[in-house]
């Protein structure tokens, strides 16, 4: 990943940033003309006396001349508004695309983390960094070059306009800017340092809260709740102190900005008024300068705010890179590669003098070797904590050996992509993870490697899918359709979807979960809009069952539920409720 935030912006949005700068340059002449029109309206159309006047080849009386100037002013307002609308929308889209790319890169890196890294980084910390801490970066990405070029262009245009009207007033307008340019960044660096410390403190608090949630039983079992609360109180107090210092410095910066911004109008009214009195300046020019300076404060404040945001974004980005830039990441090629030549899971599996060390240097596995002819059954035995579980995970390529190597037919397993190890080698640990979704999704999770059969979209759905692919390509995301059929039925030894269902039932029966899953299914509600075919089949089966009961002349022995009849096989309460209370 790029080490700096501007490197990231330049690499992935150079063309978009160039378009924004060109549009900014094109908009500035129109903005300058919009500043000059009010002066012409006051001095020439309202206070003027030489009529009719020639205006670009047209002889106009006073009122028509006034209306023409007002119409031009209105047109310029619309044009300037159009430029601003385009810039806002375009930079917003550019920023969101960069934010999407950054989040995707971070999520991809999480998938490439070595497993020991998850013992150092809590789940909450990773989630917070990928979602919350990247959010402010999205707004800055779009403004990285657009805001300083646009607001800086407006500021220079306004300054140039004021100097054209009178150089003394122009000089008075910018006299205090060097002071602000020196003082504000100096104060802002102090705020940035505090902000960096605040982020670290909040992360440590998140980690401690995660520990309390995971180890809540230990807290209650040992009566250490007051100790834990004291720790949280101390951490919250530290965060409060940091934030309080940030507030004081930020509002002091705001106070200085406001004070220095209100001094130039004093010079305008005093010096400008004197120039009007002695006849060296027109009233229209003074009004135009006052109006221009009123607009100057906005881009100047935006530029000062941009400096603060730039420093915040730089700190956030560098902290993210620091957390996600690891030396022992799984190579990206191994994560996505689809090799043409896939070695068979036969032959010899050899572990040669393998070892596995913890971060503190403690060896969990030391000098383990084996040679097994595949296919075969074998067991790794040893005392609790003796490393047999870690050795099994090294065979499954879930952990990388610190020393030695594990090979299949002289091919180092660590050099093979996950497309091989993830499909040819399975690992079932003591604490499997259940993903959100259905039981079927979890049972078939190991068969979803690549999309096998795409969905044929039509109409608006096809257009939406094309746009989804286009945006994914632009932002460096994978463009696979999550709604496609990902299940590789052949990998499960099945010939079709129906055959796959039978195999699922077979394996559930082997592990003793068939009745449990069946019972769970009976207790579920079916959403008709999501499973219309299943609902239709169930209603047809109910009707068919009723017909068979009647044909077999056993309907007297089976009493079906009917809302209009009393059911003699149910209690009075169940008849009144037409059901059984839950809970």
Describe each region flagged by the PLM.
Residues 7-14, 115-116, 132-141, 145, ...:
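An intracellular "coupling" helix at the cytosolic face of ABC transporter transmembrane type-1 domains
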Residues 1-34, 45-73, 79, 83, ...:
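Membrane-integrated ABC transporters
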Residues 395-396:
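Helix-to-loop junction immediately C-terminal to a conserved catalytic motif
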Residues 49, 96, 104-128, 132-134, ...:
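Short intracellular "coupling" helices and adjacent cytoplasmic loop segments at the cytosolic face
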Residues 17-27, 146-197, 270-281:
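Transmembrane helices of ABC transporter permease
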